[in-house]
A protein has these predicted regions:
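Conserved N-terminal phosphate-binding loop of PLP-dependent enzymes in the Aspartate aminotransferase
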Residues: 1-330
Length: 330
């Protein structure tokens, strides 16, 4: 703050240090660029993917959250909802966005195959632990299957690691699962709790589509339009750099993961003891306790007339939820 102020709009020492720290920690990140938020990073990655592949369509997992931009407001929270949550967004904004059912590789391949005849698939976006930070969990086999299909059909694999980055491990979920995305979205922790927490990292052959000037060969190429007044501001970059340093020094990811395992084990014992119709699971420190309607597996979105009766069962669970609360208080 004493040497360059809170925001200069110019390159500075801690922008470099933070980028290098992320690149050193995450193997697939040859190059990194700060953005103003995870939402902006997701927008930028879509533009990179379309420039790099010359394809149009983006496929995301149904229910996943990749920010609140017009295009990504499709199929959020619950798989199959499509545009129904995107109030205020014209339907033509969703012309080149699709959702695929989590854990269903056949559904994804069907869309990839059909897209070959309607503009191609530029990228497949996924939260590597499942939509909404793993609220709908997915299998390791599915994650690796998505990577395989992206390679087969020439689409970029985009990992949204806003939640999982530097939390599941220093290498994020991709290091945990042993998968190599082409682009990675970062957020939250990379600014140490300060504003401007967003970033895109990835392979050099794709990251070259950001910024100005020529690519490494000297050939002029079209670049993705990105920006932001507070992007890469010195305060946030400095906070982010020292936060990541401290996470690594203290082995915080592993310790937090062990705590997540412990709390979920305890919750599972309570659920079993009281015979509650609840579900508990975790990936490291990302813990879930599901008690309500979105986990009604018998819901069939193709038969909407059956849904009210199924959701009515949630009311029956009120007593069990009271028991759960009492168990917490005991």
């Amino acid at each position: 703050l004493n040497t360059c102020g809170p925001s200069t709009g110019l390159f500075h020492e801690f922008e470099y240090k933070l980028a290098k720290k992320i690149s050193d920690s995450v193997e697939t990140v040859d190059m990194f660029r700060m953005m103003g938020s995870g939402t902006e990073a997701c927008m930028g990655a879509a533009r990179i993917a379309r420039l790099a592949t010359k394809h149009k369509n983006i496929i995301k997992m149904g229910g996943a959250y990749h920010g609140w931009s017009d295009q990504m407001a499709y199929g959020i929270r619950v798989n199959g909802t499509k545009f129904t949550q995107a109030h205020g967004v014209p339907l033509n904004c969703f012309m080149f966005i699709q959702e695929t059912t989590p854990n269903d590789l056949d559904d994804l391949e069907k869309k990839l195959r059909l897209n070959q005849f309607r503009g191609g698939t530029a990228a497949v976006y996924m939260e590597p632990v499942g939509p909404e930070s793993g609220t709908t969990p997915i299998t390791v086999e599915y994650v690796k299957g998505v990577e395989r299909l992206c390679r087969k059909y020439g689409a970029l694999l985009v990992f949204d690691e806003v939640v999982t980055g530097f939390r599941i491990g220093m290498a994020g979920a991709q290091g945990y699962f042993g998968v190599s995305p082409d682009l990675t979205i970062f957020g939250k922790v990379i600014a140490g709790g300060y504003p401007g927490a967003g970033g895109i990292g990835g392979k050099r052959e794709y990251m070259k589509y950001l910024g100005a000037g020529l690519d490494s060969s000297g050939k002029k190429i079209h670049k993705a339009l990105v920006g932001g007044t507070m992007t890469a501001n010195p305060l946030s970059c400095c906070a982010g750099y020292f936060t990541l340093e401290e996470i690594e020094r203290t082995n915080a990811c592993q310790k937090a993961g062990q705590m997540g395992d412990r709390i979920c084990a305890g919750l599972k014992e309570l659920v079993k003891k009281h015979g509650l119709p609840f579900v508990v699971w975790n990936t490291g420190s990302i813990c879930h306790l599901e008690t309500v309607g979105t986990m009604h597996y018998q819901i069939n979105w193709k038969k909407p007339w059956e849904i009210p009766a199924i959701l009515g069962e949630t009311g029956i669970r009120q007593k069990e939820m009271e028991h759960m609360g009492a168990a917490y208080m005991a």
